[in-house]
């Protein structure tokens, strides 16, 4: 195949990928993301030109570096700055963090749909909502059921007309090393902690974009999504995936009025903190000292209020436990220390092809976003 034919084939492939991912959101970004995270540069003619150009000899021209990023600007305006009267759906909201988020959303004047699986927990949760549970709709829901997601959206539309906020809170804390996990443990954790996020986006995003009033997705990950846990390899893998999914969605949805956040809490005082939640058939007994630790952990309602603060500000990262900051700094320092220096010229075509990953912009904008005046979550 000639270089011209090869370039045309790559360009056609890029166009097909861009079209399948809503091309209008990617034009101007110079990239499209295909299956497996393959980055395809939409300006492939420059890539082909670079491949036809000889590489400068070592010691000749100075190493070519990526172009400087544009001056960072604040990310998209918060789509849900005003929560009153909006509709929220929170998965696994009959207890724990999910219940805390649901109560905080209700306190802000939102209509709240509670996803649950355990009738007894739901019965204990409902009296915690004010005004006789006005504006609270429980729906029994398995987050791994894709047809169930479609039915849920239709039920919410029938009851309230629109859906604005989806909080993917259902999760399984599998206290199993990745090296010793059973296939079923891995599959179950992936289905609930990872795939359920995709299920929610596939079912709910088209509706949010259609009604145009603004929308937001939150995924409850964990500090395990940023730092590996001891004897929790399966859990860590799924929570890192949750963080990456929400980062990728931020890139994809920045040009829309749908925001994204990932919540990475430390310890929260719930009976599920160690025992893994309702959808885990591999639930294990609490380890020694767990009850004492739970009493020192964050109250679920406080965690929920932090999430709602993140929503009204459209924070990409919602972190609640500052004691983990040294560990996160060590991790990122280790990544930077492991990155080799630029020792030889880098082909411009390679830089062009990698541009969308070299500087996708969401991190610079998140830093700038943190420096502007912030809104506060308010109860009504």
Feature map (PLM): residue ranges:
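N-terminal secretory signal peptides
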Residues: 1-22, 47-49
